[in-house]
């Protein structure tokens, strides 16, 4: 948007694209490209561009169709994901695929770091793919709907950490929601944001959610199969802090 404004390129920001599509179709675009666009594009727009509507989707389709593929890739424990360049159709990320590029999800990746990895490969992949789209030499690959999984937008319920599951699942949930919207747990009737954690090798005969220990290393909490160490958290109304500061503040 900033680049467009700086170069006197018209900017449209329809609140509801289905109701304001004529502003787009009146431009008679040759091609439309979207990335992380949160609305279903109406057929009037899909059928408008000469070379079609292209979407840059942050997963290896048909896996993780939907609005939160980066978050859900980590939360669900995927070890890889990627970028798919695809044609848009009336469905949710169901169109024919044009190109893909894969990235590895490291054990310490967060939603933020994975976003940055995918951003870094998306533009070069798009630029490499565009000429074949324009000259009609690209190969279209149908998606296998039987292999599809979905990554719907993160709900408020999904932000809440239940320790009544494996340490790995808790760890993945916390890093999968970092840096937005953030996972949280309830402590003393307060929603405490959990930003960073690690899996410990210790197992305790304690009810999941029980605080085992709190020291400068972190907040150790029992899980279904062991424990996790919360390293960085945030009290309502305050900035993020490590547990050393939290112990001083508590």
Predicted regions and their residues:
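One-carbon transfer enzymes
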Residues: 1-181, 190, 226-229, 235-237
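An anion-binding loop in the catalytic cleft
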Residues: 163-248
